[in-house]
From Swiss-Prot:
Pfam families: Late_protein_L2. One of its GO terms (biological process) is viral penetration into host nucleus. The gene is L2. A motif (Nuclear localization signal) lies at residues 1-11, 455-463. Interacts with major capsid protein L1. Interacts with E2; this interaction inhibits E2 transcriptional activity but not the DNA replication function E2. Interacts with host GADD45GIP1. Interacts with host HSPA8; this interaction is required for L2 nuclear translocation. Interacts with host importins KPNB2 and KPNB3. Forms a complex with importin alpha2-beta1 heterodimers via interaction with the importin alpha2 adapter. Interacts with host DYNLT1; this interaction is essential for virus intracellular transport during entry. InterPro entries: Late_L2. Keywords: Capsid protein, Cytoplasmic inwards viral transport, Disulfide bond, DNA-binding, Host endosome, Host Golgi apparatus, Host nucleus, Host-virus interaction, Late protein, Microtubular inwards viral transport, Phosphoprotein, Viral penetration into host nucleus, Virion, Virus entry into host cell. This is Minor capsid protein L2. GO terms for molecular function: DNA binding; structural molecule activity. It comes from Human papillomavirus 62. Disulfide bonds join C20-C26.
């Protein structure tokens, strides 16, 4: 198949003329075309010698239409009238005839001209009449100021924008004593506002509720599955050292006390370095901690980012690592029961029930003897009263059975069995008939209110079945 040749387009004549005029290598048709010396241009020049076209502008020049320009279709251009200076009218010169005198009178008769003020003519013989006064009192002018009255007026305008509103202070709830609470109704139309309380942590919760009303954002309670800690792209590295919980940065670099362990930690390593723990090699970032639950254990997790490779552009590439430390590795049992140690040894007396589990016996005896009220009376009274108060010492926390001001007899509950005591029954008869009902006060430090509520099914709203250290008034 023959090869098809394509002719390349030459540059324009103007571009060629700019480059080849100086060197003299222009083609034969470039210079006449640019300089206007073609055959057509020569014919127009020769024809213009014998034919006059006027100011029509016919030729090889720019098409401007001559001096008058092109006339638009549909009419002639509007004419412009030049307004020149206004000429003055000529002054008519009167010719002088032969009969006119050549002397012109310049001064007219002065008697005809009246100018200036008229002078009066005095014709009388008597002179002016002068009037005089015979009073010899000198003229005294009274220049004392007259009394002036000053009037000051004031006007009060009521502006609602600056009126202070009326403030009604309702009586607040006051505590009369340590056990009795009283409240009074509010004044006016104002009333107290009841705010529903929210239970943040309960036994029936799922574990995802916040443990306080304003939880700290540092450590999550239980991390959700959205973290992606156990994916195929994440390397799993267990950390057995418990220092990972409090000092995670000490595994990747040397100790630096100026950092917050609850936030993301960023490391700036030199080109060649050796970390304290080889598992933390090339770690540049340790993210915030998260508490997770895995197979019945509590686990502290931190996600780290390695920077093993570095490109020419400065980007660092590395794997994603999941560092975790098991805080409570409790093995699961088949029955799920955990054996508990008895709090009191066998053969303990009733006086041992008043002491703390972790109290030191030798130190407790020294504390009891230092209290004068306890050295002279037994620990347990004869009427089986229970009262306890905590006492803190420099060695340990000890619970010592001191008096709280009220000795309340212990009452039986649904799961408390006490020995029966023979208490004599005494009937009190009032000396006068009671016509007005009085309040009956039940004194108790710990008792159950409506024990039948215990066997009711649990609801979302928790019911308080008992009160402590209070009085109940019943009609």
């Amino acid at each position: 198949m023959p090869k098809v040749l394509h002719r390349r387009k030459r540059a324009s004549a103007t571009d060629l003329y700019r480059t080849c005029k100086v060197s003299g290598t222009c083609p034969s048709d470039v210079i006449p075309k640019v300089e206007g010396n073609t055959l057509a241009d020569k014919i127009l020049k020769w024809a213009s010698l014998g034919v006059f076209f006027g100011g029509l502008g016919i030729g090889t020049a720019s098409g401007t239409g001559g001096r008058t320009g092109y006339i638009p279709i549909g009419g002639r251009p509007p004419s412009v009238v030049d307004i020149g200076p206004v000429s003055r009218p000529p002054v008519v010169i009167e010719p002088v005839g032969a009969t006119d005198p050549s002397i012109v009178t310049l001064v007219e008769d002065s008697s005809i001209i009246e100018a200036g003020a008229v002078h009066p003519n005095f014709t009388g013989s008597s002179g002016f009449e002068v009037t005089t006064s015979s009073t010899a009192t000198p003229a005294v002018l009274d220049i004392s100021p007259t009394g002036t009255t000053v009037q000051v007026s004031s006007t009060n305008f009521l502006n609602p924008a600056y009126t202070e509103p009326s403030i009604i202070d309702p009586p607040q709830t006051g505590e009369l004593s340590g056990h009795v609470l009283t409240s009074t109704p509010t004044a006016g139309s104002h009333s107290y506002e009841e705010i529903p309380m929210v239970t943040f942590a309960s036994n029936a919760g799922t574990g995802s509720e916040p443990i306080s009303s304003t939880p700290l954002p540092g450590v999550r309670r239980v991390a959700g599955p959205r973290l992606g800690l156990y994916t195929k792209a994440t390397q799993q590295v267990p950390v057995a050292d418990p220092a990972f919980v409090s000092r995670p940065a000490s595994f990747a670099t040397f100790d630096n006390p100026i950092y917050d362990p609850e936030e993301t930690i960023i490391f700036e390593h030199p080109s060649i370095y050796t970390p304290p723990d080889p598992d933390f090699l090339d770690i540049v970032t340790l993210h915030r901690p998260a508490l997770t639950s895995r197979q019945g254990t509590v686990r502290l997790s931190r996600v780290g980012q390695r920077a093993s490779l570095r490109t020419r552009s400065g980007k660092r590439i590395g794997a994603r690592v999941h560092f975790y430390h098991d805080i409570s590795p409790i093995p699961s049992t088949t029955t799920g029961d955990i054996e508990l140690q008895p709090l009191l040894p066998s053969g303990s007396s009733s006086a041992d029930t008043l002491y703390d589990v972790y109290a030191d016996d030798q130190h407790l005896d020294a504390v009891l003897q230092s209290v004068p009220s306890m050295s002279s009376r037994p620990l347990v009274p004869s009427n089986a009263t229970i009262s306890a108060t905590s006492v803190a010492s420099s060695h340990t926390n000890v619970t010592v059975p001191l008096s709280t001001g009220l000795s309340v007899p212990a009452s039986t509950g649904p799961d408390v069995e006490l020995p029966q005591f023979s208490v004599p029954v005494s009937v009190l008869t009032p000396s006068f008939p009671a016509t007005t009902p009085y309040s009956i006060y039940i004194v108790g430090s710990d008792y159950y209110l409506f024990p039948s509520y215990i066997f009711f099914p649990k609801k979302h709203k928790r019911l308080h079945y008992f009160f402590t250290d209070g009085y109940v008034a019943a009609w």
